[in-house]
Design a protein with these regions (language model features):
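N-terminal localization/anchoring segments of enzymes in phospholipid and broader phosphate metabolism
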Residues: 13, 105, 109, 114-472, ...
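Charged, low-complexity interaction regions
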Residues: 42-48, 73
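Helical hairpin unit composed of two closely spaced alpha helices linked by a short loop
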Residues: 491-510
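Extended hydrophobic/aromatic segments used for targeting, binding, or gating
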Residues: 497-500, 514-517, 521-538
Length: 633
């Protein structure tokens, strides 16, 4: 048993020969194998290994592991569960199985086996929920439910005064509806509230006064002021815009629109596309290894696990080398999967940490909806990453939640990295009440080779409503496409104007294709996504469902430009969350992305209009009801 175990470990280490923080560790597997080979060089029959012999071998292995720990004292071990069971698929004898389980448990508890792992490897990750986070989430939920209960109680109480209340409600309804009709917010959002008010005469009115009006506008204005402070550090070069217009005359309208919304156009960039989360994080780790000045990290979800262990250890190493690490995460995205003292623990280790929008701060405004969904990593101001990935094991397929998890990202090296840096620092400022930040120390330190790869970093959020640069960028991408339009999105909950743009493109002869997940992470959202297929399919849009699992990638490409980032095609991304992405105009980059999307479509099942029409009646009815509240979900 021990011989087979050591052999399995040795082969894993030998095959991939990875390094962890510069220390090659595959030798430990060789040492264990040599140890066991000596003990059993004359015994090839695994069944002959008795329980006493197993205990002796286990003791020797533990001794070697202890020696290895002492040799590399201070090296944080990745908490990787070793899947020894795969080495012994035919084991059926209970006594031997007990011995095997005992050995596996002992090794796992020790936490001493450190892998310089390739994230594509067969390593088991974990999803760990913390009691403190669960309690915070429950408290938040109870506060919201309490508000609902108070609304209902007040409604019941007021119904006792029917004669007086009726006239008041009628007048109030007229006032609210007139206000909504003349509001600059999205029409679908307004229609949803009108339906609620009409369906729930008293309760709906109170709900709107609590959560539907713009009483929180002062908070948004304060946040917007902090975001605008960052735009003052942007540099605009009219010559770049002129050169771009000469090369891409049909795209200059979008570029000028983005510049008018404080997103400069940059050239001299090198863009690398990563089709999976595993590829992305290996590149991120390699970039962090080279950091000498600072590392900026912003994620929506942070979950402790194998991926976090490796990131944490690497960042600790860089902090000890004198590198400044600014770590920003969204409170809602991390509440369940990080311990209560997570922020304080990181700060005690030398991290600079800020938490965006604590979930208990604005429960009266349902402010848990207004999240930072951005994902940004910047190293020394010279290279940056953004995409759909989060800092949790499922994003690199170390755990299986919804089949194969497909994500994507881009690495940008060049002048456009400053756009990612400013976007990060804007959210950093917005996450604390502090003096205005000087962005200049975070500028790049090197000049980049001249080329014609054009990029604009875009970002958006509810503070910008009703101006939505991200949504309008998508619409302009759709309207300016000449040959192809390929989109990947985990959620497809779109408004009439976006749907009209897609159907018009398809009817005009553009090859419009959309990839969505076959396996959903949210069933209600999947039903709404499926509901939105109808008019698109009828107009000639081709829709593909990713059969292996869940596609979390957020991408839109035409024949010569692309947007890769954090933006889902739904109301939440376009209106309720803070998002970011990179608009790239470069045929070479677009060809790489297109190749990946075409290969992904080969793993998909295409949905037909005839199939969509054959949905069961009860599904159709439920989808129609859900669609009324789509902007509020």
């Amino acid at each position: 048993l021990a011989y087979a175990t050591a052999t399995k470990l040795y082969e894993t280490g030998e095959e991939f020969k990875e390094k962890l923080f510069g220390i090659r560790i595959t030798g430990i597997f060789s040492e264990i194998r040599s140890l066991v080979e000596v003990k059993h060089k004359n015994n090839k029959d695994e069944k002959a290994i008795g329980r006493r012999e197993i205990r002796n071998i286990k003791s020797d292995i533990e001794t070697k592991l202890k020696e290895f720990q002492e040799r590399y004292q201070g090296l944080k071990a990745s908490r990787i569960h070793i899947r020894l069971l795969k080495a012994f698929p035919g084991m059926k004898v209970m006594k031997r199985q007990d011995a095997f389980n005992d050995l596996k448990e002992k090794l796992t508890k020790k936490g001493t086996l450190v892998f310089g792992m390739d994230l594509k490897e067969n390593v088991t990750g974990r999803i760990q929920n913390y009691l403190s986070g669960i309690i915070r989430a429950i408290v938040t939920g109870l506060l919201v439910l309490l508000q609902f209960a108070m609304v209902i109680a007040l409604s019941v109480f007021l119904k006792g005064y029917t004669i007086y209340i009726y006239t008041f409600i009628q007048i109030l309804s007229i006032i609210i509806i007139i206000g909504l009709v003349n509001d600059h917010r999205n029409s679908s959002y307004k229609i949803s509230w009108i339906c609620i008010i009409a369906a729930l005469p008293i309760t709906g009115h109170i709900m709107f006064l609590l959560w539907g009006n713009r009483r929180g506008r002062k908070i948004e204005q304060s946040l917007l002021a902090k975001l605008k402070h960052g735009t003052g550090f942007y540099d605009y070069d009219p010559e770049i815009q002129r050169q771009f217009t000469e090369k891409y005359p049909m795209k200059s309208r979008l570029s000028r629109y983005l510049e008018a919304n404080s997103f400069p156009l940059y050239k001299n960039n090198q863009v690398t596309y990563y089709p999976m989360g595993e590829d992305t994080f290996e590149a991120i780790f390699a970039e962090i290894e080279k950091a000498s000045r600072f590392i900026l990290i912003n994620f929506y979800i942070v979950g402790e696990g194998v991926l976090w262990d490796r990131m944490h250890a690497l960042l600790l190493k860089k902090i000890k080398e004198g590198v400044r690490v600014l770590f920003l995460y969204d409170d809602f995205g991390a509440v369940l999967r990080t311990p209560k003292n997570f922020k304080r623990s990181l700060e005690s280790e030398g991290f600079e940490v800020r938490v965006f929008n604590p979930i208990l701060k604005y429960t009266d405004k349902l402010y848990m909806n207004y999240r930072s969904h951005q994902k940004i990593i910047v190293v020394d101001g010279n290279a940056g990453f953004t995409g759909g990935m989060n800092l949790a094991d499922e994003y690199v397929n170390l755990v299986t939640r919804f089949g194969v998890w497909k994500d994507n990202a881009v690495r940008v090296e060049g002048d456009a990295v400053w756009g990612l840096t400013v976007t990060f620092l804007q959210m950093w400022e917005a996450s604390a009440d502090s003096a205005p930040l000087d962005y200049n120390p975070f500028r790049p330190t090197k000049d980049f080779p001249a080329n014609d790869v054009y990029c604009q970093v875009i970002s958006d959020g509810p503070a910008n409503n009703p101006r939505n640069p991200v949504e309008n960028s998508y619409k302009q991408m759709i309207n300016s496409a000449k040959k192809i339009l390929y989109i990947t999105t985990p959620y497809l909950i779109i408004e009439d104007d976006m749907r009209d743009a897609l159907t018009t493109a398809a009817i005009s002869g553009i090859d419009v294709r959309i990839i969505t997940p076959k396996i959903p992470d949210k069933r209600a959202v999947k039903l709404l996504t499926n509901y939105n297929y109808g008019r698109l399919l009828e107009s000639g849009v081709r829709i593909f469902e990713y059969v292996p699992g869940f596609i979390h990638a957020k991408t839109i490409i035409s024949e010569d430009c692309a947007i890769v980032g954090t933006i889902n095609m739904d109301f939440r991304s376009f209106h309720l969350h803070y998002e970011c992405g990179v608009w790239v105009c470069d045929e070479g980059t677009v060809d790489v992305i297109k190749k990946d999307l075409l290969e992904t479509m080969e793993q998909c099942r295409e949905v037909t209009y005839e199939e969509w029409k054959r949905r069961p009646f009860y599904i159709k009815a439920f989808q129609m009801v859900l669609n009324l509240f789509a902007p509020l979900m």
